[in-house]
């Protein structure tokens, strides 16, 4: 058991890095427990009327801060995968498709963590709480794309798997603003969904249950302080004699260390394992967190924040880069060697079908994702829309090509262009592409993985590179995904498309990168324990998609939220010692 007794010298009891699903849950629950909480978010804050008018509003849609673009959509391309992720106060919730499924059983039974706990039972109450907080309801609206997906399911012989999506949307009366309907009047006013399909461009109406409408809103009401446009570059634990290891200059103070168990006034303790004793630099006396102004070239406005505990929730790419920087830079050297391993893409493929200009039905009068099917036991297919304001996204797609390699797939694309110049012309000069396009999102629970490897550059720079798992590589082609796109194209008279990176470089796209700092039984098998506490350190947690140890096979936001709720349930109220019983998961 650990009890922190340091007085003074801290800016916060807990500092949360990131304001996405894991970060917002952490901010609220820690604030409710009586802690002084700070949140650092690399992106900007958006009011409902500040979202981009379309995806062509580059400055407000795309995230390239050094070029003056501070939007909600980030696209990062590696040699093995292209990753779509979110940015801003509220994280990925600002531009996600608000689809909130509980995963199928294979996720809970994955060998990476199945021996630790009966996760389906352990997480059940936390899924229920996450659903309540995110306002999950079943979408009851049908549209032409739903009918097409239903017919595809019938044609594949899986019509019984067709399901309307559970979504985080306030439907209410379209366009009507009412007092908070979710939190007994403690939340913000809400406006009924108008089925404009703009969920992934940014909801301008106040109907989408983004984190700034629930967890983060309530966290700020409980006193959490959110600092936008701050990028964290370092985490340094205080040593036993003042100043942070490798940093210095921050105020220290006396304190007691310990191993295992959960913390007292400073938060959860470490989980034992590699180097988790009470020695110097284990986090038992707190941390310095250094941040700079996001996107700055010269005037970086470096700030040092001092906290008793830190929750890293910067999203899988941000968290893995930050922790690798700290591990290799020497400030957090005891982080498990498993850091960067078991990175998952949710085994995804993202395709598109654009219907003819004279197609009679409106494909955008819906929420972003309205229904789904399972063509087999481990594959999940959803149809998606950007609404009428996503035309710039057509540059990410080209003609559909089949399986191949980095050499043969570009050749196949050239062959498709030569054989079907009419399709190419329609695609290159498509009018109202977004209005006429069905995005096909395919996800799987299959066990495949890659790694994120740190690469060092000049002047202390660092970036991440991917490396496929040699035994179970991430798929670059999913046959049933192409089959679904081809069926939809034939059924509508449209043009089937695949992502540009997949066709040109054999690099698939995912909107749900996961892992890299996964839950494991010990430091030899994971980076964090069942409570998402970093092995080897006190009061240091990872609460985002980085901790997820397996492909979820569905949209993962609800699972990230539930796991963060689970982790926060183990943190005792401020000033109280931990409960040993609360520290043990349900045995598998």
Predicted regions and their residues:
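A glycine-rich dinucleotide-binding beta-alpha-beta segment and adjacent secondary-structure elements
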Residues: 70, 196-199, 233, 438-441, ...
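Conserved redox-cofactor binding core of oxidoreductases
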Residues: 118-232, 504-509
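Patatin-like phospholipase A catalytic core
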Residues: 143-193, 367-368, 377-447, 456, ...
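N-terminal glycine-rich phosphate/pyrophosphate-binding loop and immediately adjacent elements
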Residues: 1-111, 115-121, 291, 314, ...
């Amino acid at each position: 058991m650990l009890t922190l007794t340091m007085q003074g010298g801290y800016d916060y009891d807990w500092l949360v890095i990131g304001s996405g699903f894991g970060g917002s849950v952490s901010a609220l629950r820690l604030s409710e427990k009586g802690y002084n909480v700070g949140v650092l978010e690399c992106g900007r804050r958006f009011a409902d009327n500040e979202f981009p008018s379309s995806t062509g509003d580059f400055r407000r849609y795309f995230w390239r801060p050094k070029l003056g673009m501070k939007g909600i959509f980030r696209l990062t391309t590696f040699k093995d995968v292209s990753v779509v992720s979110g940015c801003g106060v509220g994280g990925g919730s600002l531009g996600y498709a608000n689809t909130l499924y509980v995963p199928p059983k294979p996720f809970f039974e994955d060998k990476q963590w199945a021996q630790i706990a009966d996760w389906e039972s352990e997480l059940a109450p936390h899924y229920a709480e996450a659903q309540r907080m995110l306002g999950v309801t079943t979408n009851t609206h049908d549209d032409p794309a739903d009918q097409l997906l239903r017919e595809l399911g019938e044609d594949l012989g899986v019509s019984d798997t067709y399901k309307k999506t559970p979504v985080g949307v306030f439907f209410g009366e379209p366009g009507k603003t009412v007092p908070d309907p979710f939190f007994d009047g403690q939340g913000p006013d809400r406006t009924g969904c108008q089925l404009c399909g703009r969920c992934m461009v940014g909801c301008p109406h106040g109907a989408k249950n983004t984190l700034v409408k629930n967890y983060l809103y309530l966290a700020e009401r409980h006193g959490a302080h959110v600092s936008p446009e701050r990028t964290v570059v370092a985490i340094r634990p205080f040593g036993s004699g003042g100043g942070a290891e490798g940093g210095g200059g921050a105020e220290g103070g006396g304190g007691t260390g310990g191993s295992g168990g959960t913390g007292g006034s400073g938060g959860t303790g470490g989980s034992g394992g590699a180097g988790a004793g009470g020695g110097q630099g284990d986090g038992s006396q707190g941390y310095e967190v250094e941040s700079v102004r996001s996107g700055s070239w010269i005037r970086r406005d470096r700030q040092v924040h001092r906290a008793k505990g830190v929750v890293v929730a910067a999203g899988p790419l941000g968290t893995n880069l930050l922790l690798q920087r700290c591990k290799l830079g020497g400030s957090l050297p005891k982080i498990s060697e498993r850091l960067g391993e078991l990175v998952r893409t949710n085994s995804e493929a993202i395709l598109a079908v654009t219907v003819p200009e004279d197609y009679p039905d409106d494909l955008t009068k819906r929420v972003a994702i309205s229904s789904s099917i399972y063509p087999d036991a481990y594959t999940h297919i959803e149809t998606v829309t950007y609404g009428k304001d996503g035309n710039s996204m057509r540059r990410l797609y080209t003609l559909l090509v089949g399986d191949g390699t980095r050499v043969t797939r570009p050749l196949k694309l050239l062959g498709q262009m030569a054989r079907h110049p009419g399709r190419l012309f329609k695609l290159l000069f498509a009018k109202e592409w977004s209005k006429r396009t069905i995005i096909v999102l395919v996800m799987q629970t299959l066990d495949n993985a890659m790694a994120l490897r740190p690469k060092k550059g000049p002047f202390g720079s660092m970036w991440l590179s991917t490396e496929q798992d040699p035994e179970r590589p991430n798929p670059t082609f999913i046959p049933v995904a192409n089959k679904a796109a081809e069926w939809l194209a034939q059924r509508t008279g449209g043009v089937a498309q695949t992502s540009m990176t997949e066709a040109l470089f054999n690099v698939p796209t995912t909107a749900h990168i996961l892992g890299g700092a996964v839950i494991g039984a010990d430091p030899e098998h994971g980076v964090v324990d069942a409570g998402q506490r970093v092995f080897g350190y006190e009061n240091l947690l990872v609460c985002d998609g980085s901790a997820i140890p397996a492909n979820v096979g569905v949209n993962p936001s609800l699972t990230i939220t539930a796991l963060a709720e689970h982790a926060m349930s183990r943190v005792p109220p401020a000033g109280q010692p931990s409960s040993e019983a609360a520290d043990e998961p349900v045995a598998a």
